[in-house]
Protein backbone atom coordinates (compact mmCIF):
# COMPACT_ATOMS: atom_id res chain seq x y z
CA UNK A 1 0.00 0.00 0.00
CA UNK A 2 0.90 3.67 0.09
CA UNK A 3 2.26 3.52 3.63
CA UNK A 4 4.36 0.48 2.76
CA UNK A 5 6.04 2.34 -0.08
CA UNK A 6 6.64 5.36 2.17
CA UNK A 7 8.32 3.27 4.87
CA UNK A 8 10.40 1.40 2.30
CA UNK A 9 11.74 4.70 0.95
CA UNK A 10 12.40 6.06 4.44
CA UNK A 11 14.20 2.88 5.49
CA UNK A 12 16.34 3.06 2.37
CA UNK A 13 17.38 6.61 3.20
CA UNK A 14 18.09 5.67 6.81
CA UNK A 15 20.25 2.74 5.71
CA UNK A 16 22.16 5.02 3.34
CA UNK A 17 22.88 7.53 6.09
UniProtKB/Swiss-Prot annotation:
Q: In the UniProt record, does the keyword Cell cycle occur?
A: no
Listed GO cellular component terms? extracellular region; host cell postsynaptic membrane
Query: What species was this sequence derived from?
Result: Conus caracteristicus
Q: Indicate yes or no for the key word Protease.
A: no
Q: Which domain of life is it from?
A: Eukaryota
Where is the protein localized? Answer: Secreted
A GO molecular function annotation here is: toxin activity
Organs and tissues of expression: Expressed by the venom duct.
Q: What the protein does?
A: Conantokins inhibit N-methyl-D-aspartate (NMDA) receptors.
In the record, 4-carboxyglutamate modifications are located at: 3-4, 6, 9, 13
Task: Please provide the record's keywords in A-Z order.
Answer: Gamma-carboxyglutamic acid, Ion channel impairing toxin, Ionotropic glutamate receptor inhibitor, Neurotoxin, Postsynaptic neurotoxin, Secreted, Toxin
Extra information: The mature peptide does not contain cysteine residue.
What name goes with this protein?
A: Conantokin-Ca2
